Amino acid sequence: MKSRNSCKLMLLNKNHLLSLWIVMSFHEAMLYECQSEGKVKCCLCARRCLISDDSTGFCMVRKNQGGTLYALNYGKAVSVGVDPISKKPLSHFNPGALVMSVAAAGCNFRCQFCDNWMISQDKEVAGRLFPPAEVVKAAKDSNCQGISYTYTEPTIFMEYAYDSAKLAHEAGLFNTFVSNGYMTPEAVKAK
């Protein structure tokens, strides 16, 4: 199973904004296995998609490019907001706390009744650039006590949530993961 590595394309451009966009657009995914004929097996959610070259998995945001799996939604927030922790709904964990809620495109379900269908099923993998360090800064600037990875399925934006959560923890913020739970044991143990 491959471990995660950041794409080094930033060195190829002098324009920082373009460089940041390239890095965010081609972030190597966590938890995948190389297969025969250039295919990769995504080991993040329980679907364990077998993805052909130049194709995406069921979630539409994990793409095989030449035998490397990329998270197309890394650092691209489709929804950001300050919420009370009770909205997550967590009533006994840090009652009264405010959290910075962050979502990126993609989901491993297709629930017809989903409140967030428009952002979770976005085929364009839209969103504004909102790198992990900016997520933490925005949370601190908004007097939030934590960050919640929510609205869409955070398992599908694991790399983004993982990097943000590490920085948040270092900054003294707590993290919550509002998930459908359809992930692999490897995802639960990811480091």
Residue ranges, per PLM feature:
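Flexible, acidic/Gly-rich N-terminal and inter-domain linker regions that tether
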Residues: 6-97
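Conserved Radical SAM active-site core
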Residues: 64-191
